[in-house]
């Protein structure tokens, strides 16, 4: 098993030089490795508060920072959970605490719990998770605007795929973001729609691993 772990580490290092993520995933699955990151223990502990599958939380962290605790985005988001300064402060992180893995994940779970409450009228839990993910990426206000447009134009405001995601994309058109039902203005939704898809894609990958 020690040799297997060393080989896996070598593959991960080589990934920067062109080894595909699919190859790594197949390798992990073949050897039944028991974790997806060095932060699994923290993720499993904190996500109990949320009641989600820990692998969904791990998928969020992967998409946010690739498990790089020092990650900094071009917009200034930092840490594993990629908090912007104002959001970090709102959820109890001061200064460089955002770079502390345990504190960042704990605050990330608190934010996700806040978002779940914002979308608690969506009865289906799996569907609600998509709205929470979109809210994490875009902010809940823009998602609420998309829900309002969906309802106004005859789509289901509680369904993401093919409904609210479509109206989130429409928020870059003045006809829609200036609609009286919208409160948060212009928004480019492509990244958020892709983000939701990518988190679920990574989650489905993680659920195929043998733990």
Where are these regions (language model features)?
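Catalytic glycan-binding domains that act on GlcNAc-containing polysaccharides
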Residues: 17-211
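Bacterial N-terminal signal peptides
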Residues: 2-10
